[in-house]
């Protein structure tokens, strides 16, 4: 059948099972929006308040569902406003297709109105980028883009379409999209070598990253941990891949990881990294990371092997398939003395906080209790992000959504909106500091417009908490540009944008506020006032080895 480029785009989105797109219209993309209007019963379009919010919403949708998130923007500033969201998705391996329209082909390269080489701008932060100048290749380009976005190590793909292509016509033939194949690239000998190393270990430890969630390998990870009788630590991206209430679970590793995980990994004789990339925030000083251990790395991306840490063995391939094959090669191991030692560390070094005043750790524990750990938690970046990771028990994958690699302030609210649309039966709560919330709080208008029942918790300490913590510990308490004591009333802002607002100043007010927000089934902001001096512990100083982890008690003893 003969269709315009815009109609072909919509049909290809339907082929891919896309039910929601997030975006903002403009002149160059008008033809596409006209086609979307005609198919609004099949594909829902969420009009965000800013294109960055659209990118973050597509990201949150993708992380919460496992499907490809789709965002759209017009040429020029519309396209460039997507850049931070695309980079966020790239750093955390999130499948996304960003669709932009550009000026017509005769105007390209002439500094035309709202012309930007968005494919060039995003080249370093996408898996692939396409510029479509011919309607005949549009359908195949879209199909390739979705395949690239979700296959192997997922990531964002850009499709930039000139406006004349969206109006031109050609023959369109629908196709049936086949599921992606799970690929492995190791030999039987390599698999057996890894199994032998595991069997010889006396003090194994499992280090779990976001790849376990991406591949859907939670069941295989749990079986693996039981088979080799090992404790499990995770990264920010790995939250929920392993049951956070399991006795084997020792919490996060790295800069704000638990003492148990950091000390345990420093003592182990075998470290098995599952879908983890040895980020600098995890390893600390790489020369002294897990220096007593042989290291095995399982990852879908061959480029990650030996990139940050030299390993003794590796298996490259889809983690779920790899673990299925590896588990079949393993006999049941038992390490009672090692596990008893880890349990002693857990008992000796529990997470602690000052429970006299209202604090973010207390708030997260109350949210955990009220929701029974069943909510989807999104976060922005900073102290609140770490507290949300530490004090909520994540028992299932795709329930903790946070910007780990790029560390994007302003990420959480858009992501929460996307997650709520993707998982409408879940309670979705965004945890943000007052500094982060300022950056994209306009997306409350989006939640209000569509009555998306997200809960926005603002942890308000009137400072840029994480930066201020570093200034306190390492910069002589010189608080340069980290004090936010001004006249902003977040509750009034929320109400002005059409949301319900609740202010919490006491511990006993937290649970009722959360319960009320859930019951309202409408967008709600809860502002929680906490002390400016609260700090995130444990902590590993930048450049130090993870065995040098310290907490508030250690600081008191030193003073």
Identify the function of each model-found stretch:
Residues 411, 415-453, 459:
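Catalytic phosphate/nucleotide-handling subdomain of diverse soluble enzymes
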Residues 136, 174, 292-383, 507-508, ...:
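Phosphate/pyrophosphate-binding active-site segments
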Residues 27-29, 76, 93, 156, ...:
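Glycine-rich phosphate/pyrophosphate-binding beta-alpha loops
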Residues 114, 449-542:
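Thiamine diphosphate
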Residues 295, 367, 379, 418, ...:
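Hydrophobic, well-ordered secondary-structure elements that form the walls
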Residues 46, 180-184, 403-406, 476-485, ...:
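A short acidic, glycine-rich active-site loop
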Residues 1-330, 366, 370-373, 453-456, ...:
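N-terminal alpha/beta PP-like core and its mobile active-site loop of ThDP/TPP-dependent enzymes
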Residues 6-10, 14, 18-19, 32-37, ...:
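Active-site diphosphate/adenylate-binding microenvironment
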């Amino acid at each position: 059948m003969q269709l315009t480029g815009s109609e072909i785009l919509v049909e290809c989105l339907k082929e891919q099972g896309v039910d929601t797109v997030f975006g903002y219209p403009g002149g160059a993309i008008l033809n596409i929006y006209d086609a979307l209007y005609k198919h609004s019963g099949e594909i829902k379009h969420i009009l965000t308040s800013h294109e960055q919010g659209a990118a973050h919403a597509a990201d949150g949708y993708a992380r919460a569902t496992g499907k490809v998130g789709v965002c759209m923007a017009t040429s020029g500033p519309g396209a460039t406003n997507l850049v931070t969201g695309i980079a966020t998705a790239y750093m955390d391996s999130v499948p996304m297709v960003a669709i932009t329209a550009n000026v017509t082909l005769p105007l390209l390269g002439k500094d035309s109105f709202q012309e930007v080489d968005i494919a060039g701008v995003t080249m370093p932060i996408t898996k692939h980028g396409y510029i479509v100048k011919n309607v005949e290749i549009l359908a195949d380009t879209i199909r390739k883009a979705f395949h690239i976005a979700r296959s192997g190590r997922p990531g964002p793909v850009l499709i930039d379409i000139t406006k004349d292509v969206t109006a031109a016509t050609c023959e369109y033939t629908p196709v049936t999209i086949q599921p992606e194949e799970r690929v492995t690239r190791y030999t039987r000998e390599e698999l057996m070598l890894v199994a032998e190393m595991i069997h010889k270990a006396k003090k194994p430890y499992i280090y779990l990253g976001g790849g376990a969630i991406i591949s859907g390998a939670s069941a295989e990870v749990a079986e693996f941990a039981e088979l080799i009788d090992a404790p499990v630590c995770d990264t920010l991206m790995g939250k929920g891949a392993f049951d956070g209430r399991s006795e084997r679970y020792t919490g996060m590793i790295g800069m704000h990881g638990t003492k148990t995980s950091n000390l345990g990994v420093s003592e182990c004789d075998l470290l098995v990294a599952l879908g983890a990339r040895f980020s600098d925030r995890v390893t600390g000083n790489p020369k002294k990371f897990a220096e007593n251990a042989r290291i095995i790395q399982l990852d879908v991306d061959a480029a990650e092997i030996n990139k940050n840490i030299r390993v003794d063995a590796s298996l490259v391939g889809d983690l779920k398939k790899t673990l299925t094959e590896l588990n079949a090669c393993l006999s049941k191991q038992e390490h009672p003395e090692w596990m008893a030692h880890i349990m002693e560390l857990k008992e000796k070094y529990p997470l602690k906080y000052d429970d006299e005043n209202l604090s973010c750790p207390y708030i997260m524990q109350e949210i955990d209790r009220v929701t029974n750990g069943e909510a989807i938690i999104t976060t922005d970046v900073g102290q609140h992000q770490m507290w949300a990771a530490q004090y909520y028990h994540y028992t299932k994958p795709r329930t903790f959504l946070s910007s780990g690699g790029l560390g994007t302030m302003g990420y959480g609210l858009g992501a929460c909106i996307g997650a709520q649309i993707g998982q409408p039966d879940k309670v979705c709560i965004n945890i943000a500091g007052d500094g982060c919330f300022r950056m994209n709080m306009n997306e409350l208008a989006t939640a209000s417009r569509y009555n998306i029942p997200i809960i926005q918790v603002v942890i308000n300490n009137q400072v840029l908490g994480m930066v201020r913590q570093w200034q306190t510990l390492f910069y002589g308490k010189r608080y340069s540009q980290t004090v936010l004591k001004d006249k902003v009333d977040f509750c009034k802002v929320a109400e002005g944008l059409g949301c319900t607002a609740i202010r919490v100043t006491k511990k006993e007010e937290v649970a009722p506020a959360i319960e009320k927000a859930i019951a309202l089934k409408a967008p709600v902001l809860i502002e929680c006032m906490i002390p400016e001096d609260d700090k995130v512990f444990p902590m590993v100083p930048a450049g130090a080895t993870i065995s040098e982890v310290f907490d508030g008690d250690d600081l008191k003893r030193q003073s």
